[in-house]
């Protein structure tokens, strides 16, 4: 996202999303039910969609996540405690579509990990993930006034394949994954 500041006034920022489900199905050679399963597992990143075989797709996604997203986020933002950042990613990956906020996440860290991470640090990390287009937050629209400040949001991955790669393809919850797919379809 910062590239726009590097080249201020020299062009327009264009954000390319992964393939939508409809776009994915236009290149998928199979029935729509198998296509939906494949899309919910491996996502719509063209580099991955064009690969053959489950192992090759999984390896490409895991490499993309760790070597591109994670490394760039940590390097660009000078993250000192990479373990906490990764733990936050794991929490978000295993709870897509759940209402949460930095304060709740801080309490989770304190209870489960005996960590002293602050809600401000978590807020920064969430911003890093959003700036890298890894996740997006969905704000509630029925809130007014001061309640906006700490109202829980839902976090969705821009690509379910990246989410699944993060948790090593081990936690497949069809309802939450479908909610993420629907969010991504509506976002476009």
Where are these regions (language model features)?
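Gly/Ser/Thr-rich beta-alpha loop segments that engage phosphate groups in nucleotides
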Residues: 11, 45-46, 91, 99
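Acidic/polar active-site rim loop that often engages polyanionic ligands
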Residues: 5-9, 18-19, 41-44, 65-69
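Short regulatory helix/loop adjacent to the ATP-binding pocket of P-loop NTPases
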Residues: 1-13, 26-32
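Hydrophobic/aromatic beta-strand patches that form the interior of the parallel beta-sheet core
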Residues: 12-15, 156
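Conserved AAA+ ATPase small/helical "lid" subdomain
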Residues: 33-66
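Conserved catalytic cores of phosphodiester-cleaving nucleases, focusing on short active-site segments
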Residues: 1, 17, 182, 186
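Accessory nucleic acid-recognition modules appended to NTPase machines
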Residues: 53-188
């Amino acid at each position: 996202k910062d590239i726009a500041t590097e080249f201020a006034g020299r062009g327009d920022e264009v954000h390319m999303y992964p393939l939508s489900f409809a776009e994915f199905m236009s290149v998928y050679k199979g029935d729509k039910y198998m296509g939906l399963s494949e899309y919910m597992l491996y996502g719509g990143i063209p580099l991955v969609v064009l690969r053959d075989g489950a192992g090759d797709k999984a390896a490409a996604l895991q490499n993309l996540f760790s070597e591109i997203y994670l490394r760039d986020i940590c390097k660009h933002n000078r993250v000192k405690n990479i373990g906490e950042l990764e733990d936050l990613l794991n929490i978000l990956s295993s709870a897509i579509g759940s209402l949460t906020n930095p304060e709740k996440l801080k309490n989770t860290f304190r209870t489960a990990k005996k960590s002293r991470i602050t809600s401000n640090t978590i807020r920064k990390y969430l911003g890093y993930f959003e700036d890298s287009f890894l996740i997006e937050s969905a704000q509630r629209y029925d809130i007014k006034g001061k309640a906006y400040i700490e109202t829980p949001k839902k976090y969705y991955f821009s690509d379910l394949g990246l989410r699944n790669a993060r948790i090593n393809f081990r936690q497949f919850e069809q309802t939450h994954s479908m909610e993420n797919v629907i969010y991504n379809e509506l976002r476009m």
